[in-house]
Amino acid sequence: RQQIIAKIKKLLAKADDNRGNFNECKLAMSIAMRLMAQYKIEQAELKDKPAEAQKVAERSFKTTKHAREIPYITTIMRDHFQADMAYSNYTAYVYATEDSVDNALYVAEFLYNNMKAALRAEKRKARERFRLVCEPDFYCGFMSGICSALKKQEMETFAENESYAIICQTELALVEEYLQREVKPKEVHTHNPLKDYESFNRGYKRGENTTINPAIA
């Protein structure tokens, strides 16, 4: 029991630490939520509550499915995203998770559905309008906000007084292997005015371009 709790904590911490790296944050969160869902499913089955187990399984599938679509959304917003832009502004999005770990899945679905609705509507409008309606901090709240709120939970109470179902040791080994993997920092594009000028001025012979003074250039 303590082994799985420790791994969930590590996964949430890793997602939080890499909130500026879309893929790493998404991957760590997906694994952590899968482990938590697996625990809840097995507990429901042990208590002979198949309907509850099915409900948890469906909710878990929807959330991880949504997480896989995150790169598509961030492609549209990439030019306007800063890693720490809204890290302190997500409280309103994740307030429900302060009451219960179970609510985290509901909050994730709620946030995603709102973002998806905005995305679908704005695809028919100008890109600039989309930037105003669906700001980047909404995405930041979706992933890093939830993982941060979850990390604050006392995970021990999550499994307290319950016979913990054993999760496949192979899967736990894979999780540990992922946790040990180093995350390479993302390459940041830097603006090079000189290179941009040379590209713009390519094809002109020096002195023949009347729009740019060769001496100044």
Model-predicted segments: where are they?
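Long alpha-helical, hydrophobic tracts
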Residues: 1-58
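Extended, helix-rich structural scaffolds rather than catalytic motifs
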Residues: 1-2, 45-217
